[in-house]
Amino acid sequence: MRLVFAGTPEPALASLRRLIESPSHDVIAVLTRPDAASGRRGKPQPSPVAREAAERGIPVLRPSRPNSAEFVAELSDLAPECCAVVAYGALLGGPLLAVPPHGWVNLHFSLLPAWRGAAPVQAAIAAGDTITGATTFQIEPSLDSGPIYGVVTEVIQPTDTAGDLLKRLAVSGAALLSTTLDGIADQRLTPRPQPADGVSVAPKITVANARVRWDLPAAVVERRIRAVTPNPGAWTLIGDLRVKLGPVHLDAAHRPSKPLPPGGIHVERTSVWIGTGSEPVRLGQIQPPGKKLMNAADWARGARLDLAARAT
């Protein structure tokens, strides 16, 4: 099939590469978000998908208003048979959805109808889910609600960060998307409606959302930190110093004997503990402002923390 591929961040690359290399499909153009400011100088940079397409000589479309009549006409002139979507980053309206005869097929990183929205991988980890996956479905104007073509499942490991899990889902999801498009092309696949039960929503995670709430139970704190690692990254204030945190550990065997209030800090020779709403957790790595991630105990020794210091 003649395909337009819509995607923006790095997790979309596995799908783009697989479709480019498929003998069954022809990626005639890539649709991605406009170049965005990046780095210390804030210079506009192309998205990972845009860079990949340019390197392979595939035309790149970067409309600031993808639902405008002008872009609908531009896409119509390309005459795609189907549009494949992986983390494009914008809602698509009815006129645009009507352009390709086989519609728009989205790869979403959850087992729909669970975790519709922008951050399904993060939501699954934060909620303590043990199984997740990826779903291919036909896009409709409402958010992630269209009929389903196929699914693939993935076990969430106890130490998975969002980055770890997303890397695996990007690969298994790429295979699912390719298989789905093959089935659509030869008319073997018919989508089925999503179940009415089990709907949950995973809104976009902001930097403010990534601030650690030490009043929550330790297991919840641990999951929430993994859910925002590596991006946007968990953070807390220690005194008036804002620091980023790597994953923390529920190390019951070596927990300090004295209780710690939520946010209370206990420094030992080789470890740093912070109190939560239940038992304390052991810090792994910490990133002070302007520095790289480092061992929390090494940082604490150099920082000479006040004995009354608290994380908030």
UniProtKB/Swiss-Prot annotation:
Q: Which reaction does it catalyse?
A: L-methionyl-tRNA(fMet) + (6R)-10-formyltetrahydrofolate = N-formyl-L-methionyl-tRNA(fMet) + (6S)-5,6,7,8-tetrahydrofolate + H(+)
Give any Pfam family that matches: Formyl_trans_C
Source organism of this protein record: Mycobacterium tuberculosis (strain ATCC 25618 / H37Rv)
Asked whether the UniProt record includes Protease among its keywords, one would answer no
This protein's source sits in the domain of life called Bacteria
List of residues binding (6S)-5,6,7,8-tetrahydrofolate: 110-113
Its cellular-component GO annotations read: cytosol
Family label: Belongs to the Fmt family.
The record describes the protein's role as: Attaches a formyl group to the free amino group of methionyl-tRNA(fMet). The formyl group appears to play a dual role in the initiator identity of N-formylmethionyl-tRNA by promoting its recognition by IF2 and preventing the misappropriation of this tRNA by the elongation apparatus.
Q: Which E.C. number(s) belong to this protein?
A: 2.1.2.9
Biological process (GO), any one: conversion of methionyl-tRNA to N-formyl-methionyl-tRNA
| Protein's name according to its UniProt entry | Methionyl-tRNA formyltransferase
NCBIfam families in the record: fmt
Instruction: Give the molecular function GO annotations.
Output: methionyl-tRNA formyltransferase activity
Residue segments, region Disordered: 34-54
Q: Does the keyword ATP-binding apply?
A: no
